[in-house]
Amino acid sequence: MKNVKIALTKGRLEKKAIEIFKTININTRELEDKGRKLIFNCENEEYNIELFLVKAKDVETYVEYGAADIGIVGKDTLMETNKEFYEVLDLNVGKCKFALAALPSFKLDQGYNRKKIATKYPNIAREYFRKKGMDVELIKIEGSVELGPIVGLADAIVDIVETGNTLRENGLVVVEDICEISARMIVNKASMKTKKDEIIKIIENVSEVIRQ
């Protein structure tokens, strides 16, 4: 049985993925009492798995370069970049959406001034406005993008919305939904050939859980 390395996004998706892994009998004991560890041995009679926790944006890099065979990451991260791997499963967890949001007075199709849009996801925002045939100025922000319209930096924002509470608390409203997103499983292209049996087994078992 070949060793399969899985890169997992820290935080909210980590917990959801661990629940799925437990359901298919992957050994998650070390993950449940991890302390400051980043690498975990999940080996048992059914699987020979090594799992490590990384930031969302790094999951793709580990998988693309083969340091990880499988990755669990949000679709938002995949949409913003253009890296080489297979996207094999929608895990149906970590569901949220991309949306255009602004102060209630904002009107997308009014005025002649070029709109300023604050976002952590410039590529996604650029494609959204390109499809609308609109020329906008994108302002990349790493922190709380909700501040943009409030302090006058931007007219609106493009960001992930889960419950909408953060928007409401800051006086913003959703102008338009852009797309739904959720957690995905990605696989290194070379690993799909060299560790095909082990990886297909994981994909099929996870698929069965998702369908239930």
Curated annotation (Swiss-Prot):
It is found in: Cytoplasm. Pathway: Amino-acid biosynthesis; L-histidine biosynthesis; L-histidine from 5-phospho-alpha-D-ribose 1-diphosphate: step 1/9. GO terms for cellular component: cytoplasm. Its EC number is 2.4.2.17. It catalyses: 1-(5-phospho-beta-D-ribosyl)-ATP + diphosphate = 5-phospho-alpha-D-ribose 1-diphosphate + ATP. Keywords: Amino-acid biosynthesis, ATP-binding, Cytoplasm, Glycosyltransferase, Histidine biosynthesis, Nucleotide-binding, Transferase. It holds the Pfam family HisG. It is an enzyme of class 2 (transferase). InterPro entries: ATP_PRibTrfase_cat, ATP_PRibTrfase_CS, ATP_PRibTrfase_HisG, ATP_PRibTrfase_HisG_short. GO terms for molecular function: ATP binding; ATP phosphoribosyltransferase activity. It comes from the Bacteria. Lacks the C-terminal regulatory region which is replaced by HisZ. Heteromultimer composed of HisG and HisZ subunits. Catalyzes the condensation of ATP and 5-phosphoribose 1-diphosphate to form N'-(5'-phosphoribosyl)-ATP (PR-ATP). Has a crucial role in the pathway because the rate of histidine biosynthesis seems to be controlled primarily by regulation of HisG enzymatic activity. Belongs to the ATP phosphoribosyltransferase family. Short subfamily. This is ATP phosphoribosyltransferase. It comes from Clostridium botulinum (strain ATCC 19397 / Type A). The gene is hisG.
